[in-house]
Regions:
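Intrinsically disordered, low-complexity segments enriched in serine/proline and basic residues
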Residues: 2-4, 8-9
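Compositional signal for N-terminal targeting/processing segments
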Residues: 11-448
């Protein structure tokens, strides 16, 4: 197995396609086991494919307790948010050490930790939130292989590829104290439950394991943090227009995961099949919006589009495309108007309604958010995955209907003029350039 962190490499290559057959269920258990009653399952956040791995692990075991790396102050509102799914929400908490900052837990069905809690509630499994309350939360982001690889290889080589890239926590840092605290809580839970599954970030997994095996002393809670259960955490509705900035997957793909759950259909390959459904839906909306009876986006063109997306994705060293890659290909194949239609479709999440009362709405951005009262705060995601970056793609959007009417109203056909001799020279020059180009192409073909 090879993995490179250069330029965000996320691909795993294996030389033996039958590697999965070499792995047994017992070996998997031993790999994740820490004690006779404790299993640690590291999670790559913001990935629908990895969330499915969490679901498979929970349903294949006989666990009587699920422990998650979240503070107790988040437990009640997180469970409330999960019960409101498929509507997307977020549990937010003010930081005592930084009044302008808010840390939050996205109630995203494509988050592995949310999937685990959801299955625990469904299967009546006890759920324990064991992270330490802190006055200031520090966000940890990394670069990981594409979790789509888990459909072909077991989790062990996948995690082994990530392990060399993980950095050890700084001594006496908040992160080190949190890890030691969680290891201490796991030892306490072992006295109460027979079979525990612990979900934590893949970036904390090796160090929690070390702290547990070395029996690191339990640190004292932060003096600046609120006692017992920490500062209050509240549940907020997320603005439908800003879901893309909060969800780990494309909103339309997340919708397909929830629709598959509702319809009891398979969702194992939605990370790829969902792209095809997104493309077909974007084309349908594009045809309806522009009232087109005949267009060039036939199945052959869409097949060429998918090949183009595949090539761009592999050039980015990924297995699954992101929205930027899909939009670039849509612009090249279908034009700006089709690319705009695809972006608008990708941002759509039909389950997100705004008619329920009881909790406020927050708008998300890149690291910033606008609260219900208009206050702009800095946001810290407790379930952060890979780093997000801005990338610019110029698109010409369709003019507004009002502007179209104004242009039509003020158009003066008698205000335009054309001089025939000049037009003939321009057209003849264009014809001359085309003929010369054809001649050069013909000569090149003759030489070859």
């Amino acid at each position: 197995v090879t993995f490179s962190s250069e330029k965000g490499t996320r691909c795993i290559r294996t030389g033996n396609s039958g590697y999965r057959d070499m792995d047994s269920s017992r070996q998997q258990r031993d790999f994740y086991r820490l004690g006779h009653s404790l299993t640690v399952f590291p999670v790559v956040h913001e990935s629908g494919d990895y969330a499915l791995s969490v679901r498979r692990e929970m349903l294949s075991g006989h666990y009587d307790c699920l422990a998650v790396a979240l503070p107790p102050s988040f437990q009640e509102p997180v469970i409330q948010g999960i019960e409101r799914l498929p509507e997307i929400s977020a549990v937010m908490q003010r930081e005592q050490g930084d009044p302008d900052a808010v840390n939050y837990v996205p109630i995203d069905p494509c988050q592995g930790m949310i999937m685990g809690i959801r299955i625990a509630l469904q299967e009546n499994i006890a759920c324990e939130f064991i992270d330490m309350e802190v006055d200031v939360y520090e966000v940890y982001e990394g670069t990981f292989p594409d979790p789509y690889a888990l459909k072909r290889i077991p989790g062990e080589p996948f995690l082994a590829a990530i392990l060399p890239t993980l950095s050890r926590p700084e001594p006496e840092s908040r992160r080190e104290r949190r890890i030691a605290y969680m290891a201490c809580r796991l030892r306490e839970l072992e006295e109460e439950y027979k079979d525990i599954l612990f979900l934590c970030s893949v970036m904390d997994w090796p160090w929690v394991r070390d702290a547990y095996l070395l029996q690191t002393p339990c640190p004292e809670p932060s003096l600046q943090a609120a006692p017992a259960h920490g500062p209050s955490a509240r549940l907020f509705r997320v603005s439908a227009a800003t879901l893309y900035f909060m969800l780990g997957e494309i909103p339309f793909i997340t919708y397909l995961y929830e629709k598959s759950r509702e319809d009891l259909t398979s969702d194992e390959n939605l990370s790829i099949d969902g792209v095809k459904e997104l493309l077909i839906e974007a084309r349908r909306r594009w045809v309806v919006k522009h009232n087109i009876t005949q267009h060039h986006l036939n199945p052959q063109v869409l097949q060429a589009y998918m090949k183009y997306v595949r090539n761009l994705t592999l050039m980015d060293r990924r297995f699954t495309p992101d929205l930027y890659t899909l939009t670039v290909a849509a612009k090249q194949v279908g034009g700006d108007s089709f690319a705009v239609s695809l972006v608008e479709t990708a941002k759509d999440f039909p389950y997100q309604t705004q008619d329920q009362e009881g909790y406020d709405t927050v708008a998300f951005g890149m690291g910033r958010g606008e609260m219900a009262d208009g206050e702009v705060v800095s946001l810290k995601n407790r379930l952060a995955g890979e780093r997000k970056v801005w990338r610019t793609l110029p698109l010409r959007s369709e003019p507004e209907v009002r502007k179209q009417k104004l242009w039509k109203y003020f158009w003066d056909p008698y205000g335009q003029c054309s001089w025939t001799p000049e037009d003939r020279k321009i057209e003849s020059f264009n014809l001359h350039v085309r003929e010369q180009a054809r001649a050069l192409i013909g000569e090149d073909l003759a030489r070859s």
